[in-house]
Amino acid sequence: MDKTKYIIKREREKEKLPFPLSKKGDIPLKKIIIGILIAIIAVGVIVGAIILINRNNKQETTELTTIQLNEVTRSVFYAPQYAAIANGYFEEEGLKLEITTGQGADKVMTAVLAGQSDIGFAGPEAAIYVYNEGKEDYIEVFAQMTKRDGSFLVSRKQNDNFKWTDLKGSTIIPGRKGGVPYMTFEYVLKQNGIDTKKEVVLDDSIKFDLMAGAFAGGNADYVTLFEPTASMTEAQGKGYIVASVGEAAGEIPYTAYFAKKSYIEQNPEIIQGFTNATYKGLQWVKEHTAEEVAKVIQSFFPDTDLEMLASSVQSYKDIDAWNETPVLKEEAFDRLQTVMTEAGELDTKAPYNVIVNNKFAENILK
C-alpha cells in the first residue's frame, strides 16, 4: 500500500472513533484518562481508610476518665451543667460523668466523704460543716455555678400583689433546717421584719424531694420549689408562684462543686478539666436564648415539655442566677457564713483561703 492510501485509511479510521488516538495511535487517550482517574480514586480510598483506622485507634487508646458526680437535685437551676454535658465539653476534657442525684446537700456530702462519689455539687455550707468538725481530709470547694437562691415561693392562693409580710401567720415548707435553702429563706423573712420564731411556722419535717408532693397534698400555705417543679405545680393548678427567693436574698454562693482535699491533690488534671467544662457551660448558657438552652438540656427533663423548660430557663436568666466564671469570691463566701450565723447554724467561721480553692478557676482566666 502506497503512502497516500495509508494516510487516507488512517484518517477514515479516526473519523469512526468517538475519541482521538494517542500520538502513537495504539492506546486511546480516553482510556489513559480513565486509568488515571481510577488510580487517583484508589489512592484516595486507601488514604481515607488509613486515616479512619488511625482515628479509631486513637479513640481506643484515649479512653475517657469516668467521674462519679453527685448533684443535690435535678433542676433547670443547673442548666449550665447539663448544657456542658450535652455539648460534649466534658468529653473534650477527657471526662465522662456518671451522675447520681442525692436529693439533699447532706446526702451529697456523705457520698463524697465515703468515697462513693468523686465530686459533689451542692451548697458550700456542707464543706464548712465538715471543716469545723476537724476532719483532716476536709472538703475544698473548687468551682461555683450559681450565685443566688434558685427557689421560688409558691402560694396555695393566687396573690398578684404579694408582699413578704403577707407570710405572717402562715405555715411554710422551706426545706431541711441547716441547708442553704432553709437558711436563705429565713434570712429573707428576717430582712422583711418577720419573726421566724413567732410569726410563721417553718415546717422542716419534709424531705427535699417530697416537698412539692406534700404541698400538693394539702400541707402548708406556702412552699419553696426549684424549677421546673415550681412551674409544673402552677400548671397543675396546685399553687401560684408569687416571688423569687434568690431575687430577694441577693447574691450568695448557693451551689458549687467540691471534693476531698486528697482527691484534688491527687487528680489536678481532672479537676482542671472539670472546671474548664463548667466554665464553657456557663458561657454557652449566657450567650444563648432560653429556647436554645431548653432544646439542649431537654433530655435531662423528659417529663417537662419544651415550652415549660424554656420558661424555667428564662426565670433564672431574669434573676441573674449564674456566675460569670467558676471563681468563688471571698465577699460572697463571707455573706454565706453570715447567713449561717444568723440562722444559728454556725458558731465558728471557716477560713476562706482553706475551704475555697480557686486555683483551677483562675487558671481559665489567665
Question: What role is predicted for each listed range?
Answer:
Residues 30, 61-197, 201-205, 214, ...:
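Short, glycine-/small- and polar/acidic-enriched structural segments
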